[in-house]
């Protein structure tokens, strides 16, 4: 591991934030567009802490895609490997907020530009600069982007980089929960660091007993589990 840059691969999208809390999508008066996507957010947070980050993804060659790129660049994120396409639009996620802070998502992403990001667009030489590669499960649906993840993870591991995985489960994006669980368990084997919530832990292991569930996550190359409650 010779690099000093955090690489992150996956989705960047527009979160449509409701103007009113505690009502259904149909009752929300209006929505405001905000740049989001967990892999992009990780880059932004790391850069704000003084680190260097590079984001690997693809956006639509549309107003929302260019808005995202401008805002990520303003955060100091390296976008030299970010692609644009006119084959699909930038993903949108409409958000409904409940009074207790819980969120419901409705995604417009069938497919979106990020899902068309192909393994051929990944250059293994990039990862000489990476000390770590981070990814989530939102882009692991059956698509070119899933295979791009495998290419990036393989290159990062061969370069000696740390691989970090946050499942960040979004059930509405998958045909069924069994397919999501299978994908997460497959990619979990390739990670060194796993970040997981209490809800995700129960979904993946089948038990809410923390002492029984957490040891089940130390599979493959997993060496560190970050467990969050709530």
Question: What is each stretch, according to the model?
Answer:
Residues 5-7, 131-132, 224:
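Structural motif
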Residues 50, 76, 158-160, 221:
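Glycine-centered short loops/turns at secondary-structure junctions
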């Amino acid at each position: 591991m010779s690099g000093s840059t955090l690489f992150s691969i996956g989705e960047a999208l527009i979160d449509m934030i409701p103007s009113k809390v505690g009502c259904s999508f149909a009752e929300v008066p209006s929505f405001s567009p905000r740049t989001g996507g967990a892999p992009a957010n990780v880059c932004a947070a790391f850069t704000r802490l003084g680190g260097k980050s590079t984001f690997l993804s693809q956006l639509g060659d549309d107003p929302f895609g260019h808005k995202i790129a401008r805002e990520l660049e303003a955060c100091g994120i390296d976008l030299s490997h970010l692609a644009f396409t006119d084959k699909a639009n930038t993903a949108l996620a409409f958000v409904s907020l409940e009074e207790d802070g819980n969120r419901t998502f409705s995604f417009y992403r069938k497919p979106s530009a990020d899902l068309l990001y192909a393994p051929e667009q990944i250059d293994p030489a990039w990862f000489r600069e990476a000390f770590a590669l981070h990814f989530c499960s939102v882009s692991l649906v059956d698509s070119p982007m899933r295979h791009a993840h495998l290419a990036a993870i393989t290159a990062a591991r061969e370069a000696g980089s740390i691989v970090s995985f946050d499942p960040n489960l979004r059930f509405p994006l998958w045909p069924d929960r069994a397919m999501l669980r299978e994908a997460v368990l497959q990619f979990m084997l390739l990670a060194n660091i796993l970040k997981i919530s209490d809800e995700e832990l129960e979904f993946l292991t089948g038990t809410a007993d923390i002492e029984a569930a957490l040891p089940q996550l130390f599979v493959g190359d997993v060496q560190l589990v970050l467990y969050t409650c709530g």
